[in-house]
């Protein structure tokens, strides 16, 4: 049998396994968007059964033989097929010792955790989620203990899963660099910065008008509307089941219209990635293999670098006035720009400004690193969270809902949060390169975001799933990730915004 014939057989197995993966994803989407509370337990069981079927299909002797043989000899395969085999082999090496029973139990635990988190958040009571989080940590440790190629710590292993090649040493250095320049800038703004008007930010804006604006923004970003759906959820996310079925979610607050604007732009960035990977990637099962940091790069790019720019605020200002029906008639374009960029330490990560956002990420990074590595207990999380928010941001956390329960991420294995900060830094570096090819902000000022989408499609989306993070950013920009570009961008922008001398 030729190697191409072997890959053809492997592809058929992956085609079948993908049916179960998509079914799980659709049930999860329903659970987070529209399933009744009383139906969540059954949905969780259904998802675990389907996950078990997917697991068994990708852990047969035939599957293992095809993957290992092709990994040893990939002659005849296309470059994309070779990358697929490489990804599958890495996953196989990590999962090959996990019994099906353990995988099923882990799936049940993760699915139960979501409903427990939602209940706990609504009650503002961490104790209702405490046992689920402890269970997730325990199962994660069990699965990682079965790996043959051990990392220095549990959290190092999780970082390598989410950011290929990522490690505590790498991220400690990255966050040290950010902390050294962001914290002094925040303090300077608090001590010397000019006042910025934000009183109008809490004016009521009817949800139907916010929804209409969301759809308008998604169209501006260049998303294919017939391949997309927009819904609401407690904690916004975007998922997809191929390039022609992308699901975007947001959350509307009547007294915080800005939250939805930037959530929509953020999630729309994820959706653009999903709609614009090469067809070959989907056909050969390479799609969606990029790291979380690569994905968050694009969502943060549209949310902040485009969405909060003077150019884009100039464009959307008249549309916002039109849709709001006079609610913001006394607000000038400049006042809107300053308000959506105002740096004010607060409680909520999702609604954080561009400057203090990374401090929110550092807190989560430090906590999940500690609880995954057994340095703190689950019971210590709420108090430590509150203390870190006081130390880093100078704010008092009133309850668990606005504290350690605000994010959905700990209903799954830890390690995702650093991706947001990495993505922010990647984005600025990519923008510097993009600006060499065309006037990005002249396009944004006209509301013409299609050249941006097309450039990203050609230079970013086209290689992400078949490269490591370092290969990817070097291919796009000519150098490895350099956080200095991100920090210089923040210093320049916020010094000008607050008239710092």
Can you annotate each of these PLM segments?
Residues 1-166, 466, 491-500:
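A well-structured
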Residues 2-6, 22-28, 38, 42, ...:
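C-terminal, non-catalytic "cap/extension" segments appended to globular domains
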Residues 10, 148, 259-278, 296-300:
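Active-site recognition of the HExxH zinc-binding catalytic motif
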Residues 42, 102-105, 132, 174, ...:
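Secondary-structure capping and boundary motifs in well-ordered enzyme cores
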Residues 106-257:
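Contiguous, non-catalytic segments that form substrate-binding/exosite surfaces or channel walls
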Residues 175, 179, 207-211, 217, ...:
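All-alpha helical catalytic cores of prenyl diphosphate-utilizing isoprenoid enzymes
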Residues 226-227, 280-284, 308-318, 378-379:
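Acidic/polar loop patches that form or flank catalytic/metal-binding clefts of enzymes
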Residues 288-329:
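Post-HExxH zinc-binding segment in Zn-dependent metallohydrolases
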